[in-house]
């Protein structure tokens, strides 16, 4: 691709009144508010923000004086000088989501904006989002040997600029419900032009300098920004900054943080495709990768995630224990473990949307409650759940729930294999999820085999998911691996203890005997169901249902609900990591509260 010149980018950082200041380089290592997590064995976990052999923090002598900023009066935010932060990702809830990536880009940015930072999120426009307007800004992006016209759409929600990249390759493929059509026509099937699609995203994101002032957009973010890239879809972005912009004096002081949400998806493509990225030869070694697996291309490939890790200024992931797993070896680092041991990686546990998931206000549950009224209310919600699921209504029967995407990572096959042993107990099981057809059939077969004790719902059903959280006694999370996990946070928010595998963020967030039960680590081999794993799941769930209804169980319910599971703590940890990059003008935020996240003006309308 031809390099950009300053004249091609109409705006610059001058509108911010930038002077120099010294950026702090310390990393706040503070955990989540509430119960202190510990390992399944009972020892204290270090914290929920931990760094493993991280790069040295850059020391830059810079300072900033930022002019005043104005936000709509419907939401009140803290007014610190803050940072200019631009998140880039393939998903952004609620407009688009297949899993945790969408949740993070939906929830973390508003939490950072509440602390006074100016925050933008850039993601593809997969649908005709009715709350996003056409900015009329058009850019031509070179992909392979042709140019593509790309437009910007924008909306301002919860203090965050939401920018959507508009191109037919996004909009024409995903129509109506986005779901799993974002990456392919069906689960596990990728679009053949995904490399071109997400190259557009990576090249278009830095063009935010071209966005114009208007009543809904308060002007350029300038060049002194922190880009936060997320997963393989954004892996080439730091290379494009170095190749196309910085040699021409643009984004010279910008920094890039790269966040890994799931190491299993790396963006591996044929090595011969590298020229289509229009990057110079100097970046080829960062993409170059010898693949030990056989899909999608055998042997030598380009690896987008590898390039993102190597070319960024800081590498993060979504929980401290997952960070440790990623550098532990090939099995859990998926052949990039050696790279991450070189660069270092920081784990910060995710938060959750406590406005959407709030048992005291949830419109989908029969009886609303808080920590003081949870015991009786959950029993009433259990009866409503049993009736809704077509199971015998009896509040004294322990009820286990499984909610998740039906794919190997989440362990639906392991869960199904454990059900026959669980049927020896007086227990009911509700299974909810969609995904691979073979797993949908497997769960339905459990219902057919054990009518009156097992109910499987293999379709998207948000109201039922909320009722399950409120009515279940135990939430089963038998994940083979789990970078952070959201389901256990939602369960604990509703006072439902989790019986979970001891992996990733489940270790950081679920405390054995306090807020849940640990099964131990399960095998990451997705091709087989290990008998030992089935036994771990069955044994742990039987251990859990034995205490349902006891004073010890009631105490666990209260422990779960008395935690702060919001994005507030994680946002502060993210702030301190990004401040450590030393971007000119970056200052700590001032702790603030988002006053009206559910106000009409702030509710997304995808």
Swiss-Prot record:
Residues 46-66 have a biased composition (Polar residues). InterPro entries: Glyco_trans_1, GS/SS, Starch_synth_cat_dom. Keywords: Amyloplast, Chloroplast, Glycosyltransferase, Plastid, Starch biosynthesis, Transferase, Transit peptide. One of its GO terms (cellular component) is amyloplast. The keyword Chloroplast applies. The keyword Transferase applies. This is Granule-bound starch synthase 1, chloroplastic/amyloplastic. It comes from Oryza sativa. The gene is WAXY.
